[in-house]
Amino acid sequence: MTQEKQRCADAISLAQQGIKVALISSGDAGIYGMAGLLIELLQKLDAKFRPSFAIHPGISSLQLAAALAGAPLMNDFCAISLSDKLTPWETIKERINGALVGDFVAVIFNPQSNERNWQLKTTIEMFLKYRAKTTPVLVARQVGRDQQKKRIFNLDSIPIHEIDMLSIIIIGNSSTKLVNNFLISPRGYL
């Protein structure tokens, strides 16, 4: 995560030369991917120098993790990245508070890295003020890869020391429950 601008600029340059280009972003290019950056860079160009392009959907790690868990995203949910590289921590905290007040299921991206290891603990403490300690939580790692793992915990027993940037976390809302080792956030059909 430091070469996105250059990759987009290179793709634009090649496309301007008439070369067909595929700019690949992991997961879905529009969900924490490079689609937004590409559009921003293209908008800085004079219209006559903008190559045409299309954005194709991918499968996001939140979808893969949700499928591993069962059906935790059946009702309203939000996705929040804890990385403060591009977004100030105060803004991230406001978004977490919004998720808490709205009782959203929360999908946590970029939970912690070697350099940034305190935000996840703070986030869990924030959730514990609004949610029951027994709220079910999925911790998945390397989703979609051969080393994929999933584990389900209560909110108060998340093994923070085992979580890294290859992890994704789904924290249930007040109606999320564990049924036969699957998480479900019922929509209200039954």
Language model features by range: what are they?
Residues 13-17, 43, 67-74, 97, ...:
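Generic secondary-structure signature for well-ordered alpha-helical cores
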Residues 2-6, 29, 33, 60, ...:
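Conserved active-site and cofactor/substrate-binding residues in soluble primary-metabolism enzymes
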Residues 26, 82-84, 110, 142:
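Cofactor-binding loop segments of dinucleotide-utilizing enzymes, especially the Rossmann-like FAD-
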Residues 1-53, 159:
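Class I S-adenosyl-L-methionine
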Residues 31-102:
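Class I SAM-dependent methyltransferase SAM-binding "motif I" and its flanking Rossmann-like core
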Residues 8-11, 64-66, 146-153:
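Short, solvent-exposed polar/charged micro-motifs at secondary-structure junctions
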Residues 20-21, 101-190:
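A contiguous loop/helix-start segment that scaffolds small-molecule binding in enzyme catalytic cores
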Residues 1-7, 78-86, 189-190:
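Short, acidic/turn-prone active-site loops that include or flank metal/cofactor-
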